[in-house]
Structure formats: structure tokens, C-alpha cells
Amino acid sequence: MLDLKSFYEGDDQITERKKRLFWSLQVLEQFYGRQNGLLSVPTDIWQPRYSSRDGGQLELNPKAPPLPRDELGCTSPNEPGIWNTSVHLAWVWNQVRKYVSNCSHNILKEPWRHDSMYAKVLSDFMETENMIPMCHRYDSAKFYKRNVEELRRNRDYWAPWLKEQFMYHAIPTVLNHPFLYIVGAQHNPNLAIPNTFWKRSSELALLHATWIVRMIDMVVEKEVPLADPFFGYAAAIAATVHLYYCCSAAPRLKHKSNTDFAKCRRFLKGFISSSAACGALVSSPLCLTHERLGSQTNTSRS
């Protein structure tokens, strides 16, 4: 019944709560659901789209339940609030998860092809980015200028804003992750990576992984309490990119990557008490690999 549009007729507080309940369940499924779970069939019905004719308002398939009323952080009544923009970005994130799952099963069309899943997900991501209102964007929101008390007072806005920022950078980090294509090339003979794609994708992964570290620095500085394990997962994703660059021949990049890896791991440890999955990531072979790399570096210097 929750997925029937007729269930949400009316314009009262109870109806709004029903809408938020439905889309909250959808968002949870996009982030944490199994790829073959009960709610994990991501049809276009559930994909929110943007309308350019209405100042960037979110539109849905006529069969889908409407999004809840959301004006958090908006400067105009036609703009979607931060919660509603996050719903669409979560749908893109779920496509990224599916892409990685396909890669792990050797279901991978060369990512540089125009009809590849990589191209489709990247297109959805860029469309979403293009339609996010200016009021929610990093340069306009100026999170870095806000004091601790203001952030606590307006947590209803800043908590989803932070998650959207981490998600915004995690999506291209995963799509362009060096490990994804190194492993893919080893198991798929058709995946001969051209130098142009390899260079561009690895640079994009590093750029957005570095932005995740910047966001971590700001969260720590502003003493923002976070419990959602997605933040820890995003830190782990960024850490693996920095681990790759810990082997760089460029001394400055190598040093910066080691520093950023340590920041990601320290941040990830903060979620161990609330997430067993984050605890497993902290003690994963990749983290142990970094420790061995560090000991080898120290040995070579002595």
C-alpha cells in the first residue's frame, strides 16, 4: 500500500509523514539494501527527475508516491529542499553500487563506450549535480564558516547536507576507482584500459577522495556528531584511493596520500561502536597493507 499514489491523497501532517516514511525506506534501501533484496528493484518509477520548466523542481513518475514537502535551506518556494535532493542522489548511489556489483561478476562493458553503464551513471550524476539549487551547494552554504552552536541548532539541515556532500564525492570516487579497473583488466580480456581513460579516471578518483578528506577535516573541526555508517564507508572508499597513491613515485603526493589515509582511518574508527561493518573495514587487509607500506618506508629511511 505504501507504494500507491492514492495512499497519499490529502494535504495534512499525517499524509506528509507517510510520504517521508515511504521515501525514507527507499533511501535506506538505496544505501544499505541487498542488490537482490525485496525492495531493490530500482525501476525508473522510483527515480526522481528534475523539471527545468519549474525552476528545478523534482518530478516523479505519475505512478510514484509524491515527495514530502521540504523547504529546508531553500531561498525560493520552487526549489527542492536538501532532503528531497538527497533522495535523487541516493538513487544515483544505488546505481553505483549496482555498477560495482556488475564489475565483480565480470559484467562490464568498457566504461569509455557511450552506451556503457559507467556512461549512464555518470550522466545521471551530472544531471543531478546540475539541478541542485545554488543554496545547497558548497560555496553558497559555507559550512566551513558556521560555528559549532549554529550547526547544532540547525542540525535538521546540516546533517542531510553533510551526507549529500559525502555522497556527492563518493560517487565519482567509486566510479573512477583505480582498483576497480586494475582488477577488471586482470579478469576481463576485453578490458584493455586506454591511457587516456586511465589517466582521467585516476585523477578524478584522487580529486574527489581528497575532497572527502577535506569534509572529514571540517566535520572534526566543527565537532559535528555523526552516527550514520555511510560517513565511515565514504571515508573507507577515500582511504583505498589514497592507499593506491601511497605508492606514488612523486614524494609530495606519496606523503600527502599517507597523511590522508591516516585521517580516513581515524575517522572510520569513530563508527566502530555503532557499526560492525565499519569495524571490519578498520581491520581489513587494505588497512594492514598500509601499515606494512609504512614500516617499509621507515626501514628504507633508517
Regions inferred by a protein language model and the residue ranges of each:
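Acidic, Ser/Thr-rich, low-complexity intrinsically disordered regions in fungal proteins
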Residues: 1-80, 94-116, 123-156, 176-196, ...
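TPR repeat positional signature
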Residues: 26, 85, 167-169, 235, ...
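Well-ordered alpha-helical segments within folded domains of soluble proteins
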Residues: 88-92, 174, 237-243
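Hydrophobic, well-ordered secondary-structure elements that form the walls
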Residues: 173, 212, 239, 268
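Intrinsically disordered, low-complexity transcriptional activation domains
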Residues: 271-274, 278, 301-302
